[in-house]
Amino acid sequence: MSRSLTKGPFIADHLLKKIQKLNAQGKKKVIVTWSRASTIVPLMIGHTIAVHNGREHIPVFITDQMVGHKLGEFSPTRTYRGHIKTKGDKKSKR
């Protein structure tokens, strides 16, 4: 279910302030955040935002195609190692 248009997109206040400050200075710096629920807006294009995935911060470079998505979509939280075979597993060979 999508968010109501009258409410507007959710962006964490601290993240928005950091981006506006960097845009005013004209600098591009990695911004560290834990806010995975924040929506990507056009102000963020060209910045690199390090999004926390529960263990570490994953750097995400924001492009124009990402606008409207959430930051958490680009920082996976689970590592899939495949279906690992054990050494003595004879049943899987049948």
From Swiss-Prot:
- Grouped into one coarse class, the protein's main location is plastid
Give one GO term, molecular function aspect.
rRNA binding
The subcellular location is: Plastid, Chloroplast
Q: Spell out the InterPro entries in the cross-references.
A: Ribosomal_uS19, Ribosomal_uS19_bac-type, Ribosomal_uS19_CS, Ribosomal_uS19_SF
Keywords of this entry: Chloroplast, Plastid, Ribonucleoprotein, Ribosomal protein, RNA-binding, rRNA-binding
Give an example GO cellular component term for this record. Answer: chloroplast
Record's superkingdom?
Eukaryota
Q: Which GO terms describe its biological process?
A: ribosomal small subunit assembly; translation
| A Pfam cross-reference name | Ribosomal_S19
Q: Does the keyword Chloroplast apply?
A: yes
The protein's matches in PANTHER family, at most eight in alphabetical order, are given as: RIBOSOMAL PROTEIN S19P FAMILY MEMBER, SMALL RIBOSOMAL SUBUNIT PROTEIN US19M
- Main function: Protein S19 forms a complex with S13 that binds strongly to the 16S ribosomal RNA.
Question: Into which family does the record put it?
Answer: Belongs to the universal ribosomal protein uS19 family.
Protein's name according to its UniProt entry: Small ribosomal subunit protein uS19c
Q: What organism is the protein native to?
A: Pleurastrum terricola
